[in-house]
Amino acid sequence: MSTGQAHLNPYIEGDSVLHGLDSIIKTMSLLGLLIFIALIPTGAWAFYLLTGFLLLSGYLLAELHLMEMVKRSLFVELPFFFILVPLLLMRQSDTLVQFELLNRPLNISAAGAERFFNILVRSWFSILASILYASVTHFQEFASAMRALGIPSPIVAIWSFMWRYLVLLVNEAQRMLRARSARSGRVVGQQAKAGGSLAWRASVTGQMVGSMFLRSMERGERVYQAMVARGYDGEIRAHARPILRPFHKIFLSLELLIITLLVITAFQVYGLR
């Protein structure tokens, strides 16, 4: 594994139950859980607790460091938090909190707060589920499972190339940073930092970024031409094409049935809101 791939790869080595589970089963479970999270009605907190329990059980079965995974998920969740903040101020009925910002009165309504926390929890659970899946499933297993589930080959190819080109970009960036460090030494005992002003550093950084993308594009083109020369026609045939076996179809049917029953129950209890 290259250095860039080692930095990017979210997979965590292990011998837990989830690590050894069939990749198609894991992929169907992830997709089913994401669909269920998206369909939970607003305010159905009991079903959010059920989802949280399922995720906690998954992390325990995977034998992962729970707090480390939670920190990683919160880091990914942070942009969603700022995007969702305006929801707190969209509805003016049932005011919970009233305050002023820049001499302008603002109200946080009960309906807006409920919608804010619902979407925030949904996005966080989706991130936790995705991190759990990525931690116990190799990327190649994910691509094979997508092919087995009938996902169109161009989409699988785009995912595969995205991963490989991200690795390529990281490798190029690491090479350029090493070269920069080798050329930016300073005299032992010298207190001043090596290099010029802030504007000079910004100029050098911009040139490095531009050079990195040009070099990455050239290298990517060489890789693609080498693949075409070896018979690549849009589908990677490094492994035998996986197929859906009878137990996969049974599992998928049961999963869809359970999700349907849970969603119907949630809407009957909490209604459409």
Map each language-model feature to its residues:
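Alpha-helical transmembrane segments and their helix-start/interface "positive-inside/aromatic belt" motifs
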Residues: M67-L78, F251-L254
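Structural signal for the C-terminal ends of transmembrane alpha-helices
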Residues: L39-I40, G58-L64, V136-T137
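Alpha-helical transmembrane segments and their membrane-interface exit regions
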Residues: L54-A62, E77-F82
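Membrane-helix interface segments
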Residues: A44, H65-L66, I151-I155
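Juxtamembrane/interface alpha-helical elements of multi-pass membrane proteins
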Residues: R72-L198
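Transmembrane alpha-helix interface motif
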Residues: M1-G43, F53-S57, N171-R273
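Hydrophobic transmembrane alpha-helix segments characteristic of membrane transport
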Residues: L50-S57, Q140-A145
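Short, aromatic-rich membrane-interface segments at the entry and exit
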Residues: G43-L50, E68-K71
